[in-house]
Amino acid sequence: MLDQNIXTQLXAYLER
């Protein structure tokens, strides 16, 4: 369940 949260934050971090 935390995997989905990390994915979202990862995407935003890489999209910066």
From Swiss-Prot:
Record flagged with keyword Protease: no
One example GO MF annotation: oxidoreductase activity
E.C. numbers: 1.8.1.-
Regulation: induction: By oxidative stress and catechol, and very weakly by heat shock.
Cofactor: FAD
Cofactor, how bound (note): Binds 1 FAD per subunit.
Keywords: FAD, Flavoprotein, NAD, NADP, Oxidoreductase, Redox-active center, Stress response
Primary enzyme class: oxidoreductase
Keyword NAD set for record: yes
Biological role stated in the UniProt entry: Serves to protect the cell against DNA damage by alkyl hydroperoxides. It can use either NADH or NADPH as electron donor for direct reduction of redox dyes or of alkyl hydroperoxides when combined with the AhpC protein.
Subunit structure: Homodimer.
Family membership: Belongs to the class-II pyridine nucleotide-disulfide oxidoreductase family.
Identification of the protein by name: Alkyl hydroperoxide reductase subunit F
Upper classification of the organism: Bacteria, Pseudomonadati, Pseudomonadota, Gammaproteobacteria, Moraxellales
